[in-house]
Amino acid sequence: MSNITIYHNPACGTSRNTLEMIRNSGTEPTIIHYLETPPTRDELVKLIADMGISVRALLRKNVEPYEELGLAEDKFTDDRLIDFMLQHPILINRPIVVTPLGTRLCRPSEVVLEILPDAQKGAFSKEDGEKVVDEAGKRLK
């Protein structure tokens, strides 16, 4: 079993790039398709705490439930926002990666490089062609 977990949405380019950077470090992570298998309340609360971000910082804004539920308004408690994320997992921003070195919301995808225990094994370019890692496994920016 891997010591790296990614909360992944295969329809998201950032999530796909993050997954491939994990694989480029020589590790096959545990992949949780969070839209199909959302975290429990306790898991979500722990992820947020471990990332050191606010509940609202994990909330996706460019999806239908955000508008429909009026989540732009600052009237909801953190507990209520978590309820909405559990009811509508599409509201959870992604990808979230958990490693022995930390937990991060990997936006942009290069954030994952900060918490991977093993170095990149070679060059890596994002799906759009942007070069992120050189042939020696070193981050370019």
UniProtKB/Swiss-Prot annotation:
The keyword NADP does not apply. CDD domains: ArsC_ArsC. Induction: Induced by sodium arsenite. Signal peptide: none annotated. The record marks H8, R60, R94, R107 as: Important for activity. Keywords: Arsenical resistance, Oxidoreductase. Belongs to the ArsC family. Pfam families: ArsC. Involved in resistance to arsenate. Catalyzes the reduction of arsenate [As(V)] to arsenite [As(III)]. One of its GO terms (biological process) is DNA damage response. InterPro entries: Arsenate_reductase, Arsenate_reductase-like, Thioredoxin-like_sf. One of its GO terms (molecular function) is arsenate reductase (glutaredoxin) activity. The active site is at C12 (nucleophile). This is Arsenate reductase. Its EC number is 1.20.4.1. It catalyses: [glutaredoxin]-dithiol + arsenate + glutathione + H(+) = glutathionyl-S-S-[glutaredoxin] + arsenite + H2O. It comes from Escherichia coli (strain K12). It comes from the Bacteria.
